[in-house]
Amino acid sequence: IGRIVINPDNHNELVVGVTGHLYTKNEERGIYKTSDGGATWEQTLYINDSTGIIDLAFVPGNFNIMYAAAWEKDRKAWNFKGNGNGSGIYKSIDGGTNWTKISGTDSGFPAGENAGRIGLAVYDENTLYAVLDNQFRRSKKEIDPEKSDGLTKDMFKSMTVDTFLKLDNKELNQYLKRNG
């Protein structure tokens, strides 16, 4: 279970984010909803057999508007992959009965094969905060030492101890500010 939210105005209405089995794929994951205090449950969001819901949050004062964080993961005893195309953010405007994916390539939020675990916090109807365990690799930038303003990481790789000890403190501090 990733998260359970209870309607503050109706304690019989609950929405549950289910992450799924830890080491195997299964279809019993996604979002489940009950309106009768748990006597019956309906799966209202299913993405795939390796993507579950790790977080749920609703707008304070408006249980109808809620957000869900989907997390695709594949855990084995010998390996863990915590990212995938299934990871993303979904929105419901009817208390968790229907869901629409709001994250994607055009949303401005990182999406795709390297999107990882997402945490959510809702401030109001217009403000959603999301934190992403981003598995996207940054492209390596080549720095020309002759055009550089100062020290570079590659300079340290080939630097002798004596050269390092003779570095100007101002130049070293500038490097640390740029890269620290």
Across the structure, where does each feature detected by a protein language model lie?
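Beta-propeller blade termini and top-face loops
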Residues: 1-180
